[in-house]
């Protein structure tokens, strides 16, 4: 009979140990990815025009000969995680995968700014203080570590604010790729206001695709004050908790998950005012996550739950359908419709 410890078979214990160690060292996943972006390796491979050998790569990187083996180790691990493909012919070489193509700077779809922003110690380092944060009654995690709320911190730190805006713009480009196939969202509209629209990455795509549609990018004054519009694109500074420009539709992309239910109700009520002015009955379009552990694949659920923890550190949250529905009803909306948008994002349309 096989031995056991506390009623557990050794095989169970060793499997649990492997799981534990996987998560203890999971920070290396993020940090090795950050290293590849900082070293500009995706662009180096792209510019090489074919898989690049280890010797060519380290020559371009100009690393000491004593670190060549370490470059190989990092590339091997990144390849194991799906970011590069190892080609073994005469010499070990590396090719881009779909994932690392998303890290090529200068490409239409580049998420390198997202890697840099999220993995900056300003943000990622805050997670060392989870224990302290959990005992603080009102402070967000960033309030504990940065000494102010996240949005106030951005206002006072222009360099990181630029990094954050670049990251959001890079992510918007992928969302825009999905929106191009969502004509039904914009059918019949004459105007739309993108609340929290940043520098206008999404609004510009909407304007190009629907040139007769008037688009307003509405964000904090310090975000939009130096931005120039076009014939059908304007920038307006203000506070979404106070008032939102009137339009046929309001777009909330990655906005509501930043806020508590109480704050979301305030925002949604202002949105309702904006789309029902002058007797009109417009709509509010939300691009956000909808947690559904029953229907989603495990990897998609993991992304959503990771983001839920991340949003909790802002006092926000990701929501399931019932939680969304409760918000909509309390804000005075009559019905809603949820459609899939990307791998983990949904398109939610709500009507007053």
Swiss-Prot record:
Q: Which GO BP annotation is one of this protein's? A: methylation
* Enzyme Commission number: 2.1.1.150
Provide the residue positions that the database annotates as binding S-adenosyl-L-methionine. Answer: 196, 219, 239-240, 253
Assembly with partners or alone: Homodimer.
So where does substrate get bound? 118-127
Under the heading Pfam families, the entry gives: Dimerisation, Methyltransf_2
Could you say which protein family the record assigns here? Belongs to the class I-like SAM-binding methyltransferase superfamily. Cation-independent O-methyltransferase family. COMT subfamily.
Query: What protein does this entry describe?
Result: Isoflavone-7-O-methyltransferase 8
| Gene3D superfamilies membership | Vaccinia Virus protein VP39 (3.40.50.150), Winged helix-like DNA-binding domain superfamily/Winged helix DNA-binding domain (1.10.10.10)
Q: Which PROSITE patterns match?
A: SAM_OMT_II (PS51683)
Species in which this protein is naturally found: Medicago sativa
Q: Where is the active site?
A: 257 (proton acceptor)
């Amino acid at each position: 009979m096989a031995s056991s410890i506390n009623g557990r078979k050794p095989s169970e214990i060793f499997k649990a140990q492997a799981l534990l160690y996987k998560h203890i060292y999971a920070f290396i996943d993020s940090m090795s990815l950050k290293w590849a972006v900082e070293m500009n390796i995706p662009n180096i491979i792209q510019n090489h025009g074919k898989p690049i050998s280890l010797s060519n790569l380290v020559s371009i990187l100009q690393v000491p000969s004593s670190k060549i083996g370490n470059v190989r180790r990092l590339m091997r691990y990144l390849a194991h995680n799906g970011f590069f493909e190892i080609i073994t012919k005469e010499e070990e070489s590396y090719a881009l995968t779909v994932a690392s193509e998303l890290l090529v700077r200068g490409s239409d779809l580049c998420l390198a700014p997202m890697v840099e922003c999220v993995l900056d110690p300003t943000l990622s380092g805050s997670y060392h203080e989870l224990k302290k944060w959990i005992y603080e009654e009102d402070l967000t995690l960033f309030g504990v570590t940065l000494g102010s709320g996240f949005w106030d911190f951005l206002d006072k730190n222009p360099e990181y604010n630029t990094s954050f805006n670049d990251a959001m713009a890079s992510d918007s480009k992928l969302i825009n790729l999905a929106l191009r196939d969502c004509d039904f969202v914009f059918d019949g509209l004459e105007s739309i206001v993108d609340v929290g629209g940043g520098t206008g990455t999404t609004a510009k795509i909407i304007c190009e695709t629907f040139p007769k549609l008037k688009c307003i990018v509405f964000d904090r004054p310090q975000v939009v004050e130096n931005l120039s519009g076009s014939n059908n694109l304007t920038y307006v500074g203000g506070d979404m908790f106070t008032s939102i420009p009137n339009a046929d539709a309001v777009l909330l992309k990655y906005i509501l998950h930043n806020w508590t239910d109480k704050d979301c109700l305030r925002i949604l009520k202002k949105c309702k005012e904006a789309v029902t002015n002058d007797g009109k009955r417009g709509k509010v379009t939300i691009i956000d996550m909808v947690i559904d552990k029953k229907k989603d694949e495990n990897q998609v659920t993991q992304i959503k739950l990771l983001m839920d923890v991340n949003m909790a550190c802002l006092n926000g949250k990701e929501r399931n359908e019932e939680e969304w529905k409760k918000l909509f009803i309390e804000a005075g909306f009559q019905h809603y419709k949820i459609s899939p948008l990307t791998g983990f994002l949904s398109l939610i349309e709500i009507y007053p």
